[in-house]
Amino acid sequence: MKDYLQTVTGPVAREDMGLTLPHEHLFNDLSSVVDAPCYPFSQQLVDKKVTAEIQWALKHDPYCCADNMDRKPIEDVIFEINNFISLGGRTIVDATGSESIGRDAQALREVALKTGLNIVASSGPYLEKFESQRIHKTVDELATTIDKELNQGIGDTDIRAGMIGEIGVSPTFTEAEHNSLRAASLAQINNPHVAMNIHMPGWLRRGDEVLDIVLGEMGVSPNKVSLAHSDPSGKDVAYQRKMLDKGVWLEFDMIGLDITFPKEGIAPGVQETADAVAHLIELGYADRKRQRSTVLTLIYW
């Protein structure tokens, strides 16, 4: 195990990480999947700029507003980063691992240099609906790309990724996503010091399928694997215990989101997640879960 964390400005000693947010999205861009309005009232959101006045509506239909799905201005990102630093924050892991959802290694480095924050970049395919043909490569080809970004640099930069993820698993868990999960696992095995984060369809129970590939078929060490978006399954204690007993981490990352994810479900309330986490602690799992609050779209800035 290496005793440092790879950031966009270079290695940082583990003891210097400080207060860390292990899974955030600073420059993600979801504009490729702007959707049609789900409700009559949300027709008005399509062409509007994000403001406090329409936040209530965006919480119910966030994907129909182009401005809400667009990349965040760097000035806004720096403003929020400085707020985090003022509260004692030292490190953020950016889980945007693919250009298909707006990864921008140069922008991450610029923010790190301007704020002094430790920022970790990530590498790996996201959901197939975002990746399109980019995900239709062999397992070895996908793994080679991740390995290159971990050890040499992202794209034509010398900025190295420090996490594998977040690897996309959609509600339908496509064959291409199966293979990208295998590729990410292979890259992790070749870089055993690097952690791996998996985007889970939180309202479903695909943990066994995912871990059968990652742990069973590919042989990744479970303590290097975290399952994102565990909040919606919080009341299914048997399912969550089954995942934790395999040795992986659960991430509770919808804290404070308070939105509807169209065609998937409604994010649990803060109290629901707090109760779920407290119960797992009572059951002896205090060291196998992580809390964070993912910033996905403009309405949360």
Walk through the language-model features, giving the residues of each.
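Histidine/acidic-residue-rich catalytic or RNA/ligand-binding cores of hydrolases
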Residues: 30-32, 104-105, 204-213, 235-244, ...
